């Protein structure tokens, strides 16, 4: 199988992205109990969203490679979503479309790949072991299958620790966008050993 060329994405300058600046800061104060009714209500409000989309800055950093890009994430239904990675000029480097039982990925040369597991396919084709199946929940501020997590003083996720398939992911939320209801994550960082994934969301559209 031909391998897609992601060199353009890897060579994008870090200066083209603003991953650390964010107008929303994490609330200070002691964390709240995961058993609190406020947290249960927040989770339910997020799960009630039928459609949503967000765009922003993405970075994957490891000893082997550094990838910087813009991203666009759109969920249109249960297990139906679209992920775009683009360079600063707006050209698409990767497009992924997923629906139940079928995932299609198109690289920057127009080569099309098909599989039934998006996480596995992205890992094989890009060399980035992104925990996409869990990230679909984490990016919404939901713990997914994780049971080890902490809340901030506004009853929202502040930190997750999750182990699966030999990976030990730690997720730290840097703030929330309170312009949307419910409030959605504004930036987050995932770490596993020597690899890091950073996401900064510019805005959210939720329905």
UniProtKB/Swiss-Prot annotation:
Q: Which UniProt keywords apply?
A: Cell outer membrane, Chaperone, Lipoprotein, Membrane, Palmitate, Protein transport, Signal, Transport
Q: Does the keyword Chaperone apply?
A: yes
Domain of life of the source: Bacteria
Sites of N-palmitoyl cysteine lipid attachment are 22
* InterPro entries linked to this entry: LolA/LolB/LppX (IPR029046), OM_lipoprot_LolB (IPR004565)
Residues in the signal sequence: 1-21
Q: Where in the cell is it found?
A: Cell outer membrane
Q: How does it sit in the membrane?
A: Lipid-anchor
Q: Name one Pfam family in it.
A: LolB
Which GO BP terms, alphabetically? lipoprotein localization to outer membrane; protein transport
Per the record, what is one GO cellular component?
cell outer membrane
Q: Per the record's keyword annotation, is Nucleotide-binding included, yes or no?
A: no
Q: Where is the lipid attached (S-diacylglycerol cysteine)?
A: 22
What is the protein's known function? Answer: Plays a critical role in the incorporation of lipoproteins in the outer membrane after they are released by the LolA protein.
Stored HAMAP family: LolB
Q: How does it assemble?
A: Monomer.
UniProt similarity note: Belongs to the LolB family.
Protein name in UniProt:
Outer-membrane lipoprotein LolB
């Amino acid at each position: 199988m031909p391998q897609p060329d992601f060199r353009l994405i890897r060579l994008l300058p870090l200066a083209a992205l603003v991953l650390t600046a964010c107008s929303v800061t994490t609330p200070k104060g002691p964390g709240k109990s995961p058993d609190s009714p406020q947290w249960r209500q927040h989770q339910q409000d997020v799960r009630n969203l039928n459609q949503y989309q967000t765009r922003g800055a993405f970075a994957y950093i490891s000893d082997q490679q550094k990838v910087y890009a813009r991203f666009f994430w759109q969920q249109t239904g249960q297990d139906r979503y679209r992920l775009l990675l683009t360079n600063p000029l707006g050209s698409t480097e990767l497009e992924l479309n997923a629906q139940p039982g079928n995932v299609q990925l198109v690289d920057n040369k127009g080569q099309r790949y098909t599989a039934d597991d998006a996480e596995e396919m992205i890992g094989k084709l890009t060399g980035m072991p992104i925990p996409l199946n869990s990230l679909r929940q984490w990016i919404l501020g939901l713990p997914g299958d994780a049971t080890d997590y902490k809340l901030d003083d506004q009853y929202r996720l502040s930190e997750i620790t999750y182990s699966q398939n030999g990976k030990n992911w730690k997720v730290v939320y840097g703030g929330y966008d309170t312009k949307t209801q419910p409030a959605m994550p504004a930036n987050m960082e995932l770490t596993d050993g020597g690899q890091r994934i950073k996401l900064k969301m510019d805005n959210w559209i939720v329905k």
